[in-house]
Amino acid sequence: MLRVEQLSKSFGQVEAIKDITVEFAQGEFNCIVGPSGCGKTTLLKCLSGLMPPTGGRVALDGVTVTRPPKQMALVFQDYSRSLFPWMTVRQNVAFPLRNKGLAKSEITRLVEEAVEAVGLTHAIDRYPWQLSGGMQQRTSIARAIAYQPEILLMDEPFASVDAQTRANLEDLMLSIKARYGMTILFVTHDIDESVYLGDRIVVLSSSPTVVQEILTVPLPVARDQITTKEDPQFLHLRSHVFREIMAAQAG
Ligand SMILES: Nc1ncnc2c1ncn2[C@@H]1O[C@H](COP(=O)(O)OP(=O)(O)OP(=O)(O)O)[C@@H](O)[C@H]1O
C-alpha cells in the first residue's frame, strides 16, 4: 500500500502542492489528471523519493519514502533521453537488473520475457536509433517491467507518440497490468486515456494543489479501443472528468 499523507511541496514562494492525501492499493491502475502545471510531475517526484516534500509524507507499506524504493520503477515521457544509445534493447532492459544480485540466466529470462511482453522480440538486438518512437517507448516499458516492480510510476509516457501508436501502447499497458498485477500510477493530460486505462482517476485541482475528486471507473475490466469508447458509461465519465478539470482551471 502506497499512502500519501498531507503532502505539500513549495518551491520558494511557489506553493505547488498544498495538501494531498490519497492511498493507492496493490494492483490498482490509477490515472492522475489535472490542469496544466497543477503539480502532477512534482507529485510523482515526491512519491518516488526523488524530491523531498515540504510537508507531510509518502509511506510505502508504512515506511516513509526518502529515496527511490527498490519496489518502484519509473517511465518518463522522453524515451529518447531515457535509453542508452550505445546499448541494444537487450542491454538497455538488462541494465537496472545488474545490481539485483540475480544469476545471469535469470537476468536473461527476465529480459526476454519483458521484451516479448512488449512485442519487441524481433528487435531485441537493435539499438535505440534503429527503432521508431513507439518501439523506443516499448523498450522503456520493458526495462521497467523486467525489474519486476510492485509499483510503476509513469509520467505522460505516451505524450510524444502518434495516435495509433498511443492506442497500441495503452492496450499494452492493460495487458501488462493483467499479466504482472503491479500498482500503476499514470499521469496523463488525456482525459479519454485516463478513463480508458484507469481503475481509478485522481483529479487534482489547480495549484496550490489538493485532490479535487477520486473516481472509480465502473467499466468492465476488458477494454476495447472502439467498443469501450462508445459505451455510454465511458462517455458520461469522460464528460464528468472534463468538467472537473475545467472547473479546476477556472479555480
Ligand atoms: N524545480 C522547480 N523549481 C521551481 N518551481 C517548480 C519546480 N518544479 C515545478 N515547479 C513549479 O511547480 C508547479 C507544478 O509543476 P509540475 O511540473 O509538477 O506540474 P505538472 O502538472 O506536471 O505540469 P504539466 O501539466 O505542464 O505537465 C508549477 O508552477 C511549476 O512551475
Identify the role of each PLM range:
Residues G56-P68:
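Conserved ABC transporter NBD signature motif
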Residues A146-E150:
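A short, proline-enriched helix->beta-strand linker immediately N-terminal to the Walker B motif
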Residues V33-P35:
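The feature captures the beta-strand-to-loop junction immediately N-terminal to the Walker
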Residues R98, S105-A123, S175:
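Conserved ABC ATPase "signature" region
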Residues L152-D155:
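Catalytic Walker B motif of ABC-type/P-loop ATPase nucleotide-binding domains
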Residues Y127-L131, M135:
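Conserved ABC ATPase signature
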Residues S48:
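Helix-to-loop junction immediately C-terminal to a conserved catalytic motif
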